């Protein structure tokens, strides 16, 4: 089960090396209100969360010794930076970065607590920029003033233009930064920027060492993209398939419930490609037309609900539709003309009650009309209230003892009812989280699942990844840092 939590996506499995590459981290999404303390934000429905000017959790700032800055991850020397909220790269971008360089001024990005490079390996940088007057920029990956890789470009023209370059590292370094400097000074508007390693798994854009770790575990399916991020805390932050496909710079960024923005470089296409590369069955979780019920839920109604239902149907078409279909054509343009596999659809995440059942039924009926082969999964036992149910997702988080005492939990389950998917399971309470004692409790419970696999057909530990510098949930299965 993969969810973008603990910065597991950007800067993790998706190896973007620049944090806040879209310059939007400090921009409040629609439906959020900044609080007077300058740290918290509140949704219009009343959910309070830490924001910390877009840095996320305050403990991340303190624990990682992140210097204060107006625009997260970006710092200036002999230069002035400010967000441009009108003249952006495209309709999906909420901000651009306006730079005014003095002579020998510079702009620096510190990455996800450092940028990691290996001697002899190459890295691809691209940016979109425009300038009223021609301006020369030197780009370098550096550490304490020492240039590890460098290149240069000249920006000209008053329309956004894409500039590409290669940066080849001269030596290893795990605490580097990216610096853009301007010898003569001048003004430039940056619309989007990205720095990625050329070495990715099978050339498909994901971090090689992390995918190899997954491959070594022989996974049979992957549930994606969440998790609570599917629900969001406002209609604007609810996940929509269409926001996660197409060129990276045209995907709108999204503030996740786990306190940070993602640029959605790890999107629907990338998940499906990963499933294909590792032989995993895709299990897509769609938003069912409501935000997180544990975070002051908002219900979508009318056209907004219809739009969300259609988004799910469009996602399925993208995955398995012909290349002549609307969304199949986009898939083909992304390099995959043949259909992917699409095995399972989970309708909602951790949703319940009459409001959920209404929305579940809408999506279930539409999907079965068009794609009867898709296996659907419900969040609760909707069959008890007369709804059709093929499979139900049950989540378990508790103590070691809780799991050890439930080895026989599924022995007496009704074999005439729906199948069971244990979609999230982990010891996350007590004194032994992430230790052998906890693992023994989890193993005991999983043994009980194995002996009842006639009804429990799928199971997955949760969550999968943690970037060790950005912990929002503990424990996880695998731990990562900027350096492989």
Predicted regions and their residues:
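An active-site-proximal structural segment forming one wall of the substrate-binding cleft
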Residues: 204-219, 268-274, 304-339, 399
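Catalytic-core region of carbohydrate-active enzymes that cleave or remodel glycosidic bonds
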Residues: 368, 372-375, 391, 395-470, ...
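Short, solvent-exposed turn/loop segments enriched in Gly/Ser/Thr/Pro and often Arg
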Residues: 223-235, 286-290, 380-382, 461-465
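Conserved small/polar residues in nucleotide/adenosyl-binding loops
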Residues: 479-484
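Active-site cleft segment of glycoside hydrolase catalytic domains centered on the general acid/base Glu
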Residues: 163, 204-205, 294-313, 328-374, ...
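Conserved, mostly hydrophobic/aromatic
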Residues: 127, 218, 275, 315, ...
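Structural recognition of the beta-strand scaffold that forms the well-ordered cores
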Residues: 1-2, 220-224, 282-285, 343-347, ...
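Extracellular and organelle-lumenal recognition/adhesion modules and their flexible linkers in secreted
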Residues: 1-264, 281, 296-306, 350, ...
